[in-house]
Amino acid sequence: QFFYVFHMPAFFIISGYLYRPHDWKRTIVSMMTPVVVFSLFNLCFQILISFLKEGCYDSTDLFRRIMVPYIGGVADPNVDYIVLFMGAWFPIVLMLVRLVVGDIKAFSFVGRYKVAVFLVVMAFMVTLPLWADMNNDICQMKPFLMFPSLPFFLLGMMLHDVDTQMLHKWLKRLVPLFFIVYLFMAIWNGRVEILNLHFGHNYLFFFIGAVSGSAVLFWLCSHFKD
């Protein structure tokens, strides 16, 4: 519970902080090649093990059983899905986020007006449960996870624009407050997880807890480095 508060948001914040625009084709190839290669290797391994144990491999509705864990959607409890790459949603969503913040030039305005886009996406996520069913087909699609992930990435981009020394100074001063907020949110807001759209009482509280926990983590990393 305490780990899930910040572990994936911290990755998106770091990714946003380190972001540099690249050609969109390069982004897709670099992000998806490890996923595809490992998935194919895992599939071949599973087929081999199945043949060695049972002399056959159940290929019924194979494409659907393989693709649903990647693209998401409302799962059918009667279907035996094949998970070839645990955590594949992260590189997929990170790739989509990178594409829309600047790697695709048509969306470069997202990176230029990151503060405004940040506020719009935050408002969208905070109010989403008020007018939409979080368990519908669209929300359960993996690409939809780009929306709860994007604010953290944009926050990382905004932090990159701040003077590094000033950032470290304020982080050092505020780390006790961040730690208290992190502990409170971890206990009060319950278990949270971007993958399953579990944000506790509200996305805003999840965001505050995640940023606070990430700030403590970053301070610890810089402290041990020093």
Can you annotate each of these PLM segments?
Residues 1-226:
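Alpha-helical transmembrane segments and their immediate juxtamembrane cytosolic regions
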